[in-house]
């Protein structure tokens, strides 16, 4: 018996065509038309389509992400699994958010495209077909939210977009893909390291990101301190090191009780207490700094916003990051 899969469309390049006047891609394809363009889709699953939105993924925000999560949970009793089509610019953020906040354990697979629907060799239809097959597979249950493009399956927690235009743009730079979509089966080589779920009462926290550079002054961090933030991500050099003038401002923010998470701008690897010189992660430990593990700054920002919707206690937030990010 075929599985019932609900495809929820949100927009993105996958639902765009070239505007004949401007020559650029614009939203133009409905959810139903997206599904209709996939050859042989009905042979793999019974598919229904829900059009959540049709916007570029740069327009997504945490409120829309939360609404999407609630839409999926609200339909969970009516489907065996879900596919979410999404623009690739912020796909990894929405997938990560869903992985952190969904109640359902039914398979959820997020996909997109790097070429518009009117482009030569559009990659959207194949990616949708593969994602539907992933969501319909019994092997996908309990794997957390998945991301599937170019027949590779990734954990939402670890995946990232690493090229601006190449269709083969998604990677897990730490552990590699979870599995692969083959012509007749889905094969997983490993399971995700693990995931927990948080259910925030609100998402009103104001969380900024600041990226460090060599010779950076402390004025940006001073401005962050004056902005009445609820939390701050500092994207540091190396394995978690900042210029000395930044460290001084961060210590002040920490003493004022601001939850701060330290991430690294390096694409692969983790923040660690490797050094003890002035500006190292170890030298700032007394400020209450939270280490972000191998989370990117943008995923750490989401996790901090979600955590702040659950608790305002900095030590409880630290415990959440230790469970999720390490």
Q: Could you describe each region identified by the protein language model?
A:
Residues 85-106, 242-251:
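Short Gly/Thr/Asp-enriched flexible loops that form oxyanion-binding sites at enzyme active sites
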Residues 110-182:
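Internal gly/pro-rich beta-alpha loop/helix module
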Residues 1-73, 248, 268, 291:
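ATP/NTP phosphate-donor binding region
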Residues 244-326:
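ATP/nucleoside-binding phosphotransfer catalytic cores, i.e., glycine-rich phosphate-binding loops
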Residues 2-4, 8-15, 30-31, 36-41, ...:
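Accessory alpha-helical/coil subdomains and C-terminal extensions
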